Amino acid sequence: MQRIRDDARPESIEVRGARVHSLKNVDVDVPLGELVGVAGVSGSGKSSLALGVLYAEGSRRYLEALSTYTRRRLTQASRAQVDEVLHVPAALALHQRPAVPGIRSTFGTMTELLNSLRLLFSRLASHVCPHCGTRNEPTLNVAAGLPIVCANCGKDFHAPGAESLAFNSAGACPACAGTGIVREVNRAALVPDESKSIDEGAVLPWGSLMWDLMKQVAGAMGVRTDVPFKDLTPKERDIVFNGPAVKKHILYKPKKGDDFAELDFTYFNAVYTVENALAKAKDEKGLKRVARFLEEKTCPDCGGTRLSEAARAPRVRGLNLAEASAMTLDAAVDWVRSVPGSLGADMRPMATNICESFLDVARRLLELGLGYLALDRAGATLSTGERQRVQLARAVRNRTTGVLYVLDEPSIGLHPANVDGLLGVMRDLVADGNSVVVVDHDVRVLKACDHLIEMGPVAGAEGGHVIAQGTVGDVAANPRSRIAPFLADGESVRERGCMPVSHMFDLGHIRMTTSQLHTVKPLDVDIPRGRLVAVTGVSGSGKTTMVLESLIPALKARSAGEKPPEHVRALDADGIERANLIDATPIGANVRSTVATYADIHDDLRRAFARSDEAKAGGWKAGDFSYNTGRLRCPTCDGTGSISLDVQFLPDVDIECPDCRGSRYAPEADAIHRTTKDGRELTLPQLMAMSVDQALAVTGDMRKVHARLTTLHDLGLGYLTLGEPTPALSGGEAQRLKLASEMGRAQSHAVFVFDEPTIGLHPLDVRVLLGVFDRLVASGATVVVIEHDLDVIANADWVIDMGPGGGESGGRIVAAGTPEQIAADANSITGRYLR
């Protein structure tokens, strides 16, 4: 029943017959003007409803109102598979994995804080006279567009405007074009193996970037090409690397054929060959060919600041723009607050306005826990969670109204201490007259919602239904709800048994001593072997530096007999032979990688079907059953299961292949059956369409396949279909799938490191994950988890808490001990939330 306000405006978005991905003809009303949470186990259809229906339809309908000319220049969402969606506002989505920004992007540009800072330095700085070099006091003339009269020489000059201080514009360093780095040819990479002769390919660029006949041109230049490169004279080596571009007459014989050709050819030395290829590179592929011959260095002219000398000249309170940009946001806020008071009375009103614009933007970012980031930090180095929070802060700053914001797990990478800031941002969006739909698993976020929609009851084919809906109280009281026990605080946090402190280090230690790196102070780390160890702390406290930049590289270097990173001063890890990083990066680069291929069962399935009577009668071999290269792959989609349609004026549309219906196989494959133990006859396309759990029931006679499927089931991945493309898996699913090959082996010599493995996991899925950790620990492994999730932290044997804050105020081990000891430690911010 549609709810109508007194003024006859609709109160909810009405969704009818939604069938996107796993949704089962869903009918649901989503309240407008409220904070609506979408909950459910992983793979239950949450994102399909929020992003695949609400955002897709909201953005598509808005874009359809624009002109054709404009639409052609925008990325458009395809029409959602839904019967009807009524009253959906224009929609914006804040995705779980925002795009990684380019080389010209910094934290300051992404947040637009740098705009305010540039204006501050243009209007409020002391400027240098270009005629005599005298520094002149700040003046209102700059804001009025009037020239400054130099106090020393009396000549007029104009101060630089804000645009003249931008490293993406007029303020760019001319040497590096505003990137802060320069690319130089790495001569060591040009000839990596000096035992080879030039004829044998010693000079790599001539083989990969230039015509092969350059070897003969070098010979004509007086260089011996048939002796090892190390035996060349200094003069010959100089010709190879720096020789002049002169024409030489050569007799060229192609590799194939006996004909000779006389050619006049200009000599390209090895260095120029690379420089020429770099200048001509027009795309990523071209740059990739050249990249291995280049090395990136900090620009010597600007020192990596990206700014020209003129842009670095204005000063405010003794700092130039580059120095102010190098400060963390926390430090920059304190500095900006002090600027108006440092100026004359006539300048203060304008200074206050400019500084307030900076501080208003900064306030949101500080609430979201990003105060430790420096303004000049490269955007590409920000974590997924950091980029998402920048995106969120920018959205709330725009003060729009009547917009539908769809947030996909905004609590990713967020320490419990920063959740209140996130909730404040979402509340402000609603207060401005917007609607917010948030997909999340964090119980604190869900409890703060005005309305909850829970999808389920399980993942995959059996999910896709709305199982509970209403206020938090309504859902908590619903017997069908699977999130209800966690909303009601009735669930026990502790799933694993407690390890007595007296026995914590019975299996040994991993000890590491480091010197300072980034903002992390010198550390002495002691990790108990054969235990589950959680590394915690607020964002920017040094968790990644300690584990991913120190512990993992040091362990891997030790195993390989190589030198550890310079900042790792000592490592005691006797008996550790393997260090495995299990992260959430997507598996595979394209749709040809599936669960079956990654789990290494597809080859066994192909061989099994090739042994069937029908396959033998048709002359089909195991290789023919490959959907990538085999004769039985669908000729229409070439084994991908989908085709892309080029629609003029509209975005390309990927649709299920009309011939194979997504199975990836030609019709001939449907005629080849294999009989299971229970007498069922199945084709390979039918088996690939089954979930892991369904396939388990019909592969009992295939020992290796059955064992690997059992492992996937035990990892909580029983709902995935065998033919599911691996790049489409969530971060948590990808992590567990990567573990499949490690389960069931003795692991006493191994360390497993997980980087926020609870991303995308429902509290029930977290329990499954804890079971996986338990199995690894039981097999002897040392498991180190970088984590914010309180349930995982509470179930760890040992906790190392970094902090106390982020950036310069962090970088130390605040506390180490059992979860109970951390909870009792007054210095631990994490401990407050464990009590």
Report the location of each language-model feature.
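Conserved phosphate-binding elements of NTP-dependent enzyme cores
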Residues: M1-R835
